[in-house]
């Protein structure tokens, strides 16, 4: 669907493509009056919409569904800034703590009807792609305020999300946090063990895609 068609369909004054992630989905930012909305389309987006609907129904902070169809989704904008932004140095310890707080709150949810696509036993609600760009922080309070990109959300091993954020924080895309020491600190703030072998195990699985059915 081209940008003009999207604008007409949803009554938007402006439509701008957003380049995010590696999922292959099309994402377009739409401005409609005072609202900022996001249109997402591609394989698996209907599954993501189901997960987003469930997460919103239990009151966890995430984008709200405005409309949906066959492998497309229109959502509200999350408040705050994502954790991959260049936060002021003085704020970064609090941002790390907020990332850990958000994951702990997600893990403790109950009643999730979806399994994680990753192997490994556990009873935590896992995001499945808990990386810095998918976690939002309130810039005023420095508290966790939401998550997005939920296509892999499901019940599984809590070390999955610890591993994926560990990878995100120690990698070259988020040098502002200081690399490996920050990744280890995040796991400790959560209450985990940064030397647990499951961290490297899940990073390897994610990199290889071998968890996919």
Q: Model-derived features: where do they sit?
A:
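Regulatory N- and C-terminal appendages and interdomain linkers associated
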Residues: 1-10, 48, 208-213
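Active-site acidic catalytic loop and adjacent metal/ATP-binding pocket
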Residues: 26-31, 108-160
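Short pocket-lining segment of the protein kinase catalytic domain that shapes the ATP-binding cleft
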Residues: 73-81
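Conserved protein kinase catalytic core
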Residues: 82, 135, 155, 167, ...
